[in-house]
Amino acid sequence: MAQFYSAKRRTTTRQIITVSVNDLDSFGQGVARHNGKTLFIPGLLPQENAEVTVTEDKKQYARAKVVRRLSDSPGRETPRCPHFGVCGGCQQQHASVDLQQRSKSAALARLMKHEVSEVIADVPWGYRRRARLSLNYLPKTQQLQMGFRKAGSSDIVDVKQCPILVPQLEALLPKVMACLGSLQVMRHLGHVELVQATSGTLMILRHTAPLSSADREKLERFSHSEGLDLYLAPDSEILETVSGEMPWYDSNGLRLTFSPRDFIQVNAGVNQKMVARALEWLDVQPEDRVLDLFCGMGNFTLPLATQAASVVGVEGVPALVEKGQQNARLNGLQNVTFYHENLEEDVTKQPWAKNGFDKVLLDPARAGAAGVMQQIIKLEPIRIVYVSCNPATLARDSEALLKAGYTIARLAMLDMFPHTGHLESMVLFSRVK
């Protein structure tokens, strides 16, 4: 949602007003109207009335805070997490999953000017298989903080539980905190990452000063007692494997290895369903030549290769291209070619662009795929699946395809991050004959 900021903050009288909320935005704020202006109120849900005071008044919108809630929405629920409202991780735990999905689907439909065909979802709790926890030493108390950032702040919320983490990771939180808080180097710790792979649990510790032999021994004992693969990161380039083999996870019948620092989808359940639905929408045939743009380490590329005659994956990060090639070999897939190319540059001169393709899949970052849309149109694929983590750039890029004669055949909201403001989606475009 675009928000416009004027140079000067308007003064408010703190007058109490009564409002009726009619919508929920992606940040979990109730949306109401007052004096012809949109009013955003944290903590309120659709169908709720409340007394509020305006805290910020802009030309296009205003913000308010609740003085007293006068009624409860049928979609209101008690948040499961004791840190909700302070921790910046979740914005919508006070809303039912059904309300969250309906609100996100409605927002997607408005942007795309097309009805949402389906919601692709999995378990709403215990879904996140990766967590990055900030670490901060407090000199006054000589204690170590471990947790997530506060909403709108760089301060850390000490987190002892997190119900959106997979149970294995949530159970580890107090144990990891106790271990790290006993280290001599705790003044020089940056963050700790926990990852749950199919192969086991990973812990990656970022430290900014050398570890003493005693600290190293403590960490090794902890990793062995908890059955963790331990990795140490003294800087952003170096990653030392202390214990454990190359991690891997199952994806649509394939075994994919990855580096602990590689990007993998944090919601394994939705990822499996998303990949399966993409293959179904593309209707991949044994004779098809398929192009996968922004392919990463092959999340879609490799499953596509199990059904198509040939698949080309294009990715801008060399380490991910190398990992995709390695996983193709490990899974015995010989019909895959990966290219390391910057898709934000002139793609017409890149080697993959000279090939012909029957079908195309693209999964760009938040900036979208404006630089490749014309090249995709030139290829004249029968079907295109666009996976998006930013509905605004998806809507922008879709215009090029619609003008070129494609139509939206299917539109899905991907509930990849329940209880948060993140909205992901997937669209099938078909060429009009």
From Swiss-Prot:
GO biological process per UniProt: rRNA base methylation
Coiled-coil positions: none
Gene3D superfamilies: 2.40.50.1070, Nucleic acid-binding proteins, Vaccinia Virus protein VP39
Reaction(s) this enzyme catalyzes, per UniProt: uridine(1939) in 23S rRNA + S-adenosyl-L-methionine = 5-methyluridine(1939) in 23S rRNA + S-adenosyl-L-homocysteine + H(+)
Enzyme Commission (EC) number: 2.1.1.190
Sequence positions that bind S-adenosyl-L-methionine: Q265, F294, N299, E315, N342, D363
UniProt KW Ribosomal protein keyword: no
Residue span, TRAM domain: 10-68
Transmembrane segments: none
Active site positions: C389 (nucleophile)
InterPro entries per UniProt: 23S_rRNA_MeTrfase_RlmD, MeTrfase_TrmA_AS, MeTrfase_TrmA_CS, NA-bd_OB-fold, SAM-dependent_MTases_sf, TRAM_dom, U5_MeTrfase_fam
Residues where [4Fe-4S] cluster binds: C81, C87, C90, C162
Sorted UniProt keywords: 4Fe-4S, Iron, Iron-sulfur, Metal-binding, Methyltransferase, rRNA processing, S-adenosyl-L-methionine, Transferase
Molecular function in Gene Ontology: 4 iron, 4 sulfur cluster binding; iron ion binding; RNA binding; rRNA (uridine-C5-)-methyltransferase activity
NCBIfam families, per the entry: PRK13168.1 (NF009639), rumA (TIGR00479)
Known role: Catalyzes the formation of 5-methyl-uridine at position 1939 (m5U1939) in 23S rRNA.
Family under the similarity heading: Belongs to the class I-like SAM-binding methyltransferase superfamily. RNA M5U methyltransferase family. RlmD subfamily.
HAMAP family assigned to the protein according to its UniProt record, in alphabetical order: 23SrRNA_methyltr_RlmD
Designated name of the protein: 23S rRNA (uracil(1939)-C(5))-methyltransferase RlmD
